[in-house]
Design a protein with these regions (language model features):
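Short intrinsically disordered, low-complexity coil segments enriched in acidic
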Residues: 1-5, 9, 81, 142-146, ...
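N-terminal capping segments
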Residues: 1-54
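Short linear sequence motifs
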Residues: 8, 56-59, 131
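Glycine-rich catalytic cores of cysteine/serine-nucleophile enzymes that process amide/ester linkages
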Residues: 11-13, 17, 40-50, 95-136
Length: 162
C-alpha cells in the first residue's frame, strides 16, 4: 500500500474518472500479500489487462461478494467487527441506501482509530475517523488458498510483472 499509495503501478490501469480506483488499488494490495488470483470466469478475482479483469477486481460490491464467498484458490475474507481487524484487512464505506462505494485497506492503528490507504482520493495513513459515511463493513483476511508455490512479491511490488 505504501509503495503505490500516491502513484500508479505500471502493471495496472487507473480507473479514476470511470468509477474510481479504490477497489483496484486494494485488490493490488491484497494480491501483493497473497500472490494468487482466481481465474474463475464468472466469479473470479483477477487482472490480466484493462479489458481482461474480473468485476471483483475493481468493483466494491463484487470484491465483497468474491472475498466473503470464495471457496476456491485465492484470498478469502470474512465479515468481522472493529476489534477483529489487523494490518491488511479491508474496510468498505456505504450510504444510507445500503450501497457500498469505497474500499480502503488498513495500514496502521491509533489508540482509537484505524489508519487506511486508498486510491481515488489518494491517501496513506489517513485516520478512518476523517471519512464521512453512513454505513461501514469490516473484512478480515482469513487466508489464501493456492495450488502452486507462491513467489511473486518482488517483481510485483517493483512494477515489473504480475
Amino acid at each position: 500500500a505504501r509503495r503505490w499509495a500516491f502513484s500508479r503501478s505500471p502493471l495496472f490501469e487507473s480507473y479514476n474518472g470511470i468509477g474510481g480506483d479504490c477497489t483496484n488499488f486494494v485488490s493490488q494490495c491484497v494480491y501483493a500479500g497473497s500472490c494468487v488470483m482466481n481465474y474463475t470466469r464468472d466469479f473470479g478475482w483477477y487482472y490480466s489487462s484493462p479489458v481482461n479483469r474480473a468485476p471483483a477486481w475493481t468493483g466494491v460490491e463484487f470484491f465483497y461478494n468474491f472475498m466473503t464467498a470464495n471457496e476456491g484458490v485465492g484470498p478469502y475474507m470474512s465479515d468481522t467487527y472493529p476489534g477483529g481487524l489487523e494490518l491488511g484487512d479491508v474496510i468498505q464505506l456505504g450510504n444510507t441506501d445500503g450501497d457500498f462505494y469505497h474500499t480502503l485497506i488498513i495500514v496502521g492503528f491509533l489508540p482509537d482509530d484505524y489508519l487506511v490507504s486508498a486510491h481515488s482520493n489518494d491517501v496513506f495513513n489517513r485516520p478512518l475517523s476523517t471519512y464521512e459515511y453512513d454505513r461501514i463493513r469490516y473484512l478480515h483476511v482469513e487466508g489464501v488458498r493456492a495450488d502452486y508455490p507462491i513467489d511473486c512479491f518482488d517483481g510485483f511490488i517493483n512494477g515489473e510483472r504480475i
